[in-house]
Every structure is written in structure tokens, then in C-alpha cells.
Amino acid sequence: MADTQAAAAETNGAAHDLGNGRKHILINAFDMSTVGHLSPGQWKNPKDKSATKRKLKYWTDLAQLLERGGINALFLADTYGGYDTYENSLDECIRRAAQWPITDPTIPISAMAAVTKNLTFAITASTSFEPPFLLAKRFSTLDHLTDGRIGWNIVTSWKKSAFKAIGLDNPIEHDERYRQADEYLRAVYKLWEGSWADDALNPDPENDSYIDPDKVRTINHQGKYFTLHTKHIVDPSPQRTPFLFQAGTSSAGSSFASTHAEAIFVSSHSPQVLAPKIANIRRLAAEQGRDPRSIKIFATFTPIVGRTDDEARAKHAELRSYASVIGGLVLFSGWTGIDISRIPLDQEITAADSLEAHKVRSILDSFTTTTTDIPRWTPRIVAEAAAIGGLGPVSVGSPQTVADELERWVREADLDGFNIGYVTTPGSFEDLVELLIPELRKRGVYPELPAEDAEPVTAREKVYGKGQSGLRADHVGSTYKYDVYKEDPPYVSEETVAVEEAPAEVK
């Protein structure tokens, strides 16, 4: 979004101060199994090959590139329906290839894992559309096949088109979605953490016994939204619970994140807008007995890097010539619930313009919060910003210029890392690996590549350190571990409680 061109600073190879005891910036590559992702229109660019995402080779080539650069993870966004707020129609979403069409991000993961050793994978999956048992089985399988290199980006779905696709007329109300998601997480913790003892799988050929059934607990979950009476069908994987990402900084989203997330994905045009939201999440986590620094915060960031500032500016100008302004407005309208086609070009946009309260409140807030950099949001300004980089900042410059900007965001917003978006693929991620990462390493703020003979680690160990494959002891999921497991009491509705507590003559 915001186009920043910070002045380059001298670098002498000494480690830079990132604040709050941080030593390294964590970087994920941010992609989506679709043609456009955050920069619609680049399919017209002859250098862009994003249409080849339908071929497995795209994904294996990308994974090997990211592995070569020592990137922490490939973070894959997903969506379950098209964007139909703009002009109250899906037509422009389809016409402009604004995250349409889109394939399932889960399918290529095992192929990418087979050609890498250290890269981890974070997949977006919703708590709104499938039973906890099915999701738990899929992620346990992926955790096995990747040797523990899997993460789950938890989302609560909000698009009307997605709910209609599964036979529901309207999305679940915003805060209700998070209450449902909280129960969903507790249900999958029970399956992942509480169903199998560590030594349940103990092959004993002499007695024709592969698994001890007495050490596989039946989960009997009776909640408001979900009911499970089952043993988990997959044996414990290297992490048991995948590394947990979550996106959203609304009041309900922040409360959910401070309880469940190990990493949070945020987005804004300004670090000053993010800083109080991040501080609030860390405060809420501390109130629950969690180490607030254990929650890692990643912001969207799209760098356009050249060997010099002038080269980067020339790249940016070329990329803008292919950008789809309408495609960007389609995404903006879908994310915020504001049909921007109804608003005059230079009229200020406010939250009151959103006609759909179920949309992503944190995104709506980001796009309607002003700063000194962007004192007012109008359709004209949105049109300039949204077509390249989508939600987050766009930094244009040499490796030194962009590295300065990354460091500034880390310090001013209290970030731990970034989800780095692309504009063209190939192109953007090659520049990340070949130009930007070496500069960050030169500054001492990005880890060196592991030794060839180093033992691979899990997704969670890459963040928390070797030996921490499972959930931390201060995470709520640890209360469901096999050895300490206690089944939650069945859900009882408020109406039932009121009737049971009413005097006999009232009953």
C-alpha cells in the first residue's frame, strides 16, 4: 500500500538494534494459489508466470528458491469465495482475476516438502466450513509428511459467496465467528494433544499388537457448536499441534489471538497504526499467563528491490503499467464491505460506508485510519495503493533502502517479522533471496543458512528454539495434553440454565 522510499543508511556489518532484545527478523514468503494475490493485473506482464501455479513445478521451484535463501516459511493464503461487493457483482472479480480462480493450497505441500529440508509451510484454513475432526486429520497427516514443518493460519470466514457455496444464506456474525473458532480450537487440541499417549504406538510382533488401544483416549466433546465422540484417527505427529498463525486485530480477533495464536499476521499502511494493536495483544496474552514476547507478529510488506534506488524505481514504474486498478478496488471492496464504485473519486471514505458488518473489521479499520502519511482515504488514493501490494506497505529501493524500512517497521510497530508479498513471480521472490536477504545478513539481523549436515527442525523449533516441537507450557493447548487431560463439561444453554434455576412455581 503506502509507497515508502527511505533514505539508505551506511552499513558496516555490525548487528543493528531491533529493539526488545530481538536478534533476527523472521521472514515468510507470502503467496496464494491464484493468478493475482495482492497485485492484480500482473498476468499481463510477460515476465510474470503466476498462471503456471496450476502446475506442480511452479511450487517445487519456488520451494527450492526459498530454501536457498533461508526463508522461514512459505505462507499460503486461501479464500473460499469470490469478491462480490464491488458493483454488487462477482463479474469484475472474475474479469480482473482478482484472486480468481483459486486452487487448493494443501495439495502441493508434500511435493514441496520432498524437495526441501528446512523450509516450513503455513496453510490458511477456516474454522467455518468443516468439522474439527476432518481438519485435525489433514494437518496431522501434513505434519507427518513434512517432518513437522507445517503451520496453520487460522481464519474465520466472512464472505457471503463462500457461505452460499456450502448452502448457508448468511455469514456468521463477526464476534460469534470467534466464539465458534475458540471452541473449534479446543476440539482439535483434544484430538491432537489428548487422544494418544506418547507410547500408544508400540509395535509388539510377538503379541500381534501394533497400538495399545488402552492408550488411545476417546474424546467426548459436547459444545455449543461442535460435538465429537471419537478417538483421533492419526497417531501423534512430530509437533502434534501445527504451529498456529492467526490474522485479525479487532477486539474479538485480538482476544482470540492472545489465547491461541503463536504468531499473528497483521497489516496496515503505517507502523504507528499497528503499534497500539500489537501492544494490546501482548497485554492480553500476559493477562492469560503467557509470555507476551512468545507471540510473534508478522506484517504484510511488499518490497520492490533493485540494485540501486533508480533501478528499483524503474521496476516500480514498469509494474504499475500492468496493474489492474479495478482489480485492486474489487479486493478493497471485498475486504472492507465498502462498495467503492458508489463513492465519488475524491470523497473521503469512512467506516460508516461499510454496508456489511460481517467483513474483516481489522482491515476496515486499517483502510479508514488516517496518519500523517495518508491524511485521508479517498477512492482515488485507494486506487493508487491497492493495485500493488494490497493491504500493506510497498517499499521501493535498493537492498539498503528496503532493509532500513524493514528495520524501522520492526522497531516502531514492535514486529518480529514480515510476510513478504510478491508483485511478479518469478521476479519478486528472486529479488528477496538474491538482493534483500544478503543485505539483512550483512547487518546481522537475519540468520545464516544452517550447515549442510545440520539436523532439520520443526516449524515451532525454528521460532522457539531446538527442543520446542510441541506447544509451550503457557499455551492453552497444553492443558489438553494426554497426561493432564480433563474433558470439558457439556455445554448448557443460558435458556436451560435459567429454566433449571427458576423457582418451581415459575417452571
Residue ranges and their predicted role:
Residues 2-507:
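N-terminal glycine-rich cofactor-binding segment that shapes the pocket for flavin-like pterin cofactors
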